[in-house]
């Protein structure tokens, strides 16, 4: 797997779970002899929703909710066969979305 790169993008609502998952990925990759670049924090997406509290009158009475989507990027440069096998067997938290691309 010469001149290869594995790019791993992690997304989730809880930044502690994402940081824990990136630490596991980095530790696994370094243990198998690959170079790691990252974790790189990407911009957090903030979605805001405003909801009327009152069903009829009192237009000024509103609640505001926010969902933050945190993202991290990890590049694994020159991965070995052991690195790929270890990453496939890695168990990550349930609240983390992982996207892996080869390049």
UniProtKB/Swiss-Prot annotation:
Pfam families (alphabetical): Ribosomal_S10
Function of the protein: Involved in the binding of tRNA to the ribosomes.
Family in the record: Belongs to the universal ribosomal protein uS10 family.
One of the record's GO molecular function terms: structural constituent of ribosome
Native species: Shewanella frigidimarina (strain NCIMB 400)
Annotated protein name in UniProt: Small ribosomal subunit protein uS10
UniProt KW Transmembrane helix keyword: no
Organism lineage string: Bacteria, Pseudomonadati, Pseudomonadota, Gammaproteobacteria, Alteromonadales
GO cellular component: ribonucleoprotein complex; ribosome
Claim: Cell inner membrane is one of the keywords in the record: no
Entry-linked InterPro entries: Ribosomal_uS10, Ribosomal_uS10_CS, Ribosomal_uS10_dom, Ribosomal_uS10_dom_sf
Entry keyword set: Ribonucleoprotein, Ribosomal protein
Domain of life: Bacteria
Gene Ontology biological process terms in this record: translation
Quaternary context: Part of the 30S ribosomal subunit.
């Amino acid at each position: 797997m010469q001149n290869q790169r594995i790019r791993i993008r992690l997304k989730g609502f809880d930044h502690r779970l994402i940081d824990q998952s990136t630490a596991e990925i980095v530790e696994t990759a370094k243990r198998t002899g690959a170079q790691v670049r990252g974790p790189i924090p990407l911009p957090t997406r903030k979605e805001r929703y405003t909801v009327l509290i009152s069903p009829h009158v009192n237009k000024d009475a509103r609640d505001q909710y926010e969902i933050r989507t945190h993202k991290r990027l990890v590049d694994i440069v020159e991965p070995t066969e052991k690195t790929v096998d270890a990453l496939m067997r890695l168990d990550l938290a349930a609240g983390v979305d992982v996207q892996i691309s080869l390049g």
